[in-house]
């Protein structure tokens, strides 16, 4: 388990106010920041810190998997979009979300319009 600490008191003055990540499984300490004596990302044995007092510092783990999900919400009926394909003159202001931006439905090609309808209205996931 990894724990973040800020050293508040130590025999070694270089450790004072420094921030470390302690890995209890490897018995190692990684320097996050120190005013002198240690470099950022320097890894030492936890025992090399000697005696010290510290306070816990909250750390946030980076996500292990990059990416995520994106959701475009269009509150429409299928019939409305299908009618807009058949009668675009009746829907000059119909705006939808596509790939994170707003677009007029009539400015899309017929193929793109059909794709939007197919992706927006599905029977199941």
Curated annotation (Swiss-Prot):
A GO CC term assigned to this protein in UniProt: cytosol
PROSITE patterns according to UniProt: GLY_RADICAL_1 (PS00850), GLY_RADICAL_2 (PS51149)
Molecular function via GO: formate C-acetyltransferase activity
Domain of life: Bacteria
Alphabetically ordered keywords of this record: Organic radical
Start and end residues of each Glycine radical domain: 5-125
Modified residues (Glycine radical): 100
Keyword set includes Transport: no
NCBIfam families for the chain: spare_glycyl (TIGR04365)
Record function comment: Acts as a radical domain for damaged PFL and possibly other radical proteins.
Protein's recorded name: Autonomous glycyl radical cofactor
Annotated source species: Vibrio atlanticus (strain LGP32)
